[in-house]
Amino acid sequence: MARSLCFMAFAILAMMLFVAYEVQARECKTESNTFPGICITKPPCRKACISEKFTDGHCSKILRRCLCTKPCVFDEKMTKTGAEILAEEAKTLAAALLEEEIMDN
């Protein structure tokens, strides 16, 4: 009886840990509107992104653009039209594919 109770407690604890790691906000990225020129180091990019109300920013590896990041919020996606969402996702996908293609060569 004691062993099954101990096993049950362990199973519940393990399940809680696995679930906690899965519940993570997706990170949304967008190019900075205020950062001028080519992005070389993170601090100026991060400063520009924070001034634009994002949580962080970094330079893209290949295209050297300043990308601002923040946790995705469901409500923001609902306020945009389908065409706007598709256009943003297409730009992000195109940049990711270009970087991947360049890295593979």
UniProtKB/Swiss-Prot annotation:
Thermal dependence, as annotated: Stable under extremes of temperature.
Cellular compartments per GO CC: extracellular region; vacuole
Keyword Signal in record: yes
Gene field: D1
PANTHER family, alphabetized: DEFENSIN-LIKE PROTEIN, DEFENSIN-LIKE PROTEIN 1
InterPro entries reported in the protein's UniProt record: Defensin_plant (IPR008176), Scorpion_toxin-like (IPR003614), Scorpion_toxin-like_sf (IPR036574)
Family: Belongs to the DEFL family.
Residue stretch(es) of the prosequence: 73-105
Assigned keywords, A-Z: Antimicrobial, Disulfide bond, Fungicide, Plant defense, Secreted, Signal, Vacuole
Protein known as: Flower-specific defensin
SUPFAM superfamilies: Scorpion toxin-like
Domain of life the protein comes from: Eukaryota
Summary of the function given for this chain in its UniProt record: Plant defense peptide with antifungal activity against F.oxysporum and B.cinerea. Retards the growth of the Lepidopteran insect pests H.armigera and H.punctigera.
SMART domains: Knot1
Cystine residue pairs: C28-C72, C39-C59, C45-C66, C49-C68
pH dependence of this protein's activity: Stable under extremes of pH.
Expression sites (tissue/organ): Most abundant in the epidermal cell layers of the petals and sepals, within the connective cells of the anthers, and the cortical cells of the style. Not detected in the tapetum, pollen mother cells, the transmitting tissue, the vascular bundles of the anther and style or in leaves. Expressed also in ovaries, but barley detectable in roots.
Position of the signal peptide: 1-25
GO biological process, one term: killing of cells of another organism
Subcellular location per the Swiss-Prot or TrEMBL entry: Secreted; Vacuole
Pfam families the UniProt entry points to: Gamma-thionin
